[in-house]
Amino acid sequence: MEGGASNEVAESSKKIGRGKIEIKRIENTTNRQVTFCKRRNGLLKKAYELSVLCDAEVALVIFSTRGRLYEYANNSVRGTIERYKKACSDAVNPPTITEANTQYYQQEASKLRRQIRDIQNLNRHILGESLGSLNFKELKNLESRLEKGISRVRSKKHEMLVAEIEYMQKREIELQNDNMYLRSKITERTGLQQQESSVIHQGTVYESGVTSSHQSGQYNRNYIAVNLLEPNQNSSNQDQPPLQLV
């Protein structure tokens, strides 16, 4: 029986623990301050998430019991309050079409300025500047994004290097083939020139031989003719009669 009673007490205590907290003023000052800090941070976080996820213009103003101001705005608190005042006045006095267009363009311009400011802040964070406004979780996310970006950059660089190496290898093979082709053409041309030189040399030798033999024969014929024209001293001396003195 005692065991069953203890189990019932434990179950009832668990149900009470899982129950909703009664919303009322916390009398204990310390507990109230701790709860204020927790709820304030949660509210600021929710306001930030709402502005980012839904692209909403959010302004949050909190005063503690001691009069300390806490605020958050994705644009500016003053600008959002002025927009709120104008929206309230427009509800009483509906704007004209021109005023509505002006308000629309002003909102678009404000949105673009906000986007530009966010991009500029992100660029500064990527460069390692203005990091004092980031908490540990945001710094961790920034580090992860930078590591992923560096990994993609290195992968792209490696891909380009591999492509460049492959191109250079193909180019080297093409140049080697061109070099071999040129060498073969030079060798072929050199062989033809040598053959032409040999033929020309042989023809020159042949012509010089024929000319020499012809000149030698001509010389012999001339020599024979000259000999024929010269008198034969022996025969002339024999045929002439001896002179007689009277």
Swiss-Prot record:
- Please give a single GO biological process term from the UniProt record: positive regulation of transcription by RNA polymerase II
**Classification via SMART domains:** MADS
Question: Taking every annotated instance into account, which residue ranges of this chain make up the domain MADS-box?
Answer: 18-72
The cross-references to PROSITE patterns, in alphabetical order and at most eight, read: K_BOX, MADS_BOX_1, MADS_BOX_2
Q: May I have one GO cellular component term?
A: nucleus
Give yes or no: UniProt keyword Transcription regulation: yes
Checking SUPFAM superfamilies in the record gives:
SRF-like
Q: Please list the GO terms describing molecular function.
A: DNA-binding transcription factor activity; protein dimerization activity; RNA polymerase II transcription regulatory region sequence-specific DNA binding; transcription cis-regulatory region binding
Localization, per the record, is: Nucleus
Q: What is its main location?
A: nucleus
Which UniProt keywords are listed? Developmental protein, DNA-binding, Flowering, Growth regulation, Nucleus, Transcription, Transcription regulation
Record's keyword annotation contains S-adenosyl-L-methionine? no
What job does the chain carry out?
A: Probable transcription factor. Interacts genetically with TT16/AGL32 in a partially antagonistic manner during flower development. Is essential for the coordination of cell divisions in ovule, seed coat development and endosperm formation.
Record-given protein name: Agamous-like MADS-box protein AGL5
The organism is Arabidopsis thaliana (Mouse-ear cress)
Which lineage ranks, top first, belong to the organism behind this chain?
A: Eukaryota, Viridiplantae, Streptophyta, Embryophyta, Tracheophyta
